[in-house]
Amino acid sequence: MKTLIARHKAGEHIGICSVCSAHPLVIEAALAFDRNSTRKVLIEATSNQVNQFGGYTGMTPADFREFVFTIADKVGFARERIILGGDHLGPNCWQQENADAAMEKSVELVKAYVRAGFSKIHLDASMSCAGDPIPLAPETVAERAAVLCFAAESVATDCQREQLSYVIGTEVPVPGGEASAIQSVHITHVEDAANTLRTHQKAFIARGLTEALTRVIAIVVQPGVEFDHSNIIHYQPQEAQALAQWIENTRMVYEAHSTDYQTRTAYWELVRDHFAILKVGPALTFALREAIFALAQIEQELIAPENRSGCLAVIEEVMLDEPQYWKKYYRTGFNDSLLDIRYSLSDRIRYYWPHSRIKNSVETMMVNLEGVDIPLGMISQYLPKQFERIQSGELSAIPHQLIMDKIYDVLRAYRYGCAE
């Protein structure tokens, strides 16, 4: 990360896409996409996904590292080209507890990530805990971030410190996307970004972390990009020019969250304006969902009724029976809920792919389709971009490859924007 940031600060148009997903097919796609390039791949886990207690994936940071490395070995991607990051590391998972208890767990969380070899650490202490004022004072956020940084430094080896980098910032979107419809977003004021940096510098120095400050590579701000279930707030470069100019006088770049669904031109403009770390998550699993839904429609027409997976019906039934991952995010009417379950840009389906019933139905669908020749006309109907690549000889009409290429479409836009 430090080398890439140095190249950007030296004037090169270069950025990096941060893949924020724990889905094995998304991780496989991210690694396979860059297998034959010289680029490194940044893969991040969030604190609610992966933590010392397992998170909702059931994985600790060490488990997640091995999970990613196993996929890398399968793909033939060198492990040393992978950068592992920890996102929203702080009290996010324990906001219902008092600050002392939440921070105690947060300290152990950060230590677990660093011990597991994660080298990009987002110190996110921006959320209020039980009994805290809402919002927290910037000084409190910075002081708690310094506590987390001290924890990271205390367990990092000398070798790790050479690679270790930190991201700070208080204007952080809700992990997992917005819960309600949005029409506009508040772009961070330069004064607030400067205050974030100033308060963190003061808090770090007070804890004897002057050297660690040199490892702070980025600050999270809101450049004016966001999405909800059916709306996308597109990047307007002219609105972020003050931010773009201010960061040029620092050693840092910006990290932009929720960049999913922007245009490839917007990614290029974001990187030009020093938002050099572009985080993406739901757009990748949304592309995965699109591919699976398309293949399910193809299966419906090609496979005898008694042998079909019933994949779409299984997904719908499981999500309606177990609504905990979407209920507070989606609309309440039955028909509206079904539309959101299937097609929402916030893609809450991503939490359900590991469910045994859904996983088994998808596997059945894949086996069914691997045993037949899919007519080109059907691929043109349901996966038109993939049809074009099959026609040009770039792609084969194999279900797994079709899914990979659908995810590649998202990564292609980021590659254009990051322009290495």
Curated annotation (Swiss-Prot):
Give the transmembrane region(s).
none
Q: State whether keyword S-adenosyl-L-methionine applies.
A: no
Q: Pfam families, alphabetically? A: GatZ_KbaZ-like
| GO BP term (any one) | D-tagatose 6-phosphate catabolic process
Q: Which domain of life is it from?
A: Bacteria
Gene3D superfamilies xref list: Aldolase class I (3.20.20.70), putative tagatose 6-phosphate kinase domain like (1.10.400.20)
InterPro entries from the UniProt entry: Aldolase_TIM, GatZ/KbaZ-like, GatZ_KbaZ_carbometab, TagBP_ald_GatZ
Q: Which GO terms describe its cellular component?
A: plasma membrane
List the keywords (alphabetical): Galactitol metabolism
Q: In which pathway does it act?
A: Carbohydrate metabolism; D-tagatose 6-phosphate degradation; D-glyceraldehyde 3-phosphate and glycerone phosphate from D-tagatose 6-phosphate: step 2/2
Provide the function of this protein: Component of the tagatose-1,6-bisphosphate aldolase GatYZ that is required for full activity and stability of the Y subunit. Could have a chaperone-like function for the proper and stable folding of GatY. When expressed alone, GatZ does not show any aldolase activity. Is involved in the catabolism of galactitol.
Record's subunit section: Forms a complex with GatY.
Q: Which family does it belong to?
A: Belongs to the GatZ/KbaZ family. GatZ subfamily.
The entry's protein name is: D-tagatose-1,6-bisphosphate aldolase subunit GatZ
Protein source organism = Shigella boydii serotype 18 (strain CDC 3083-94 / BS512)
The protein's gene is named gatZ
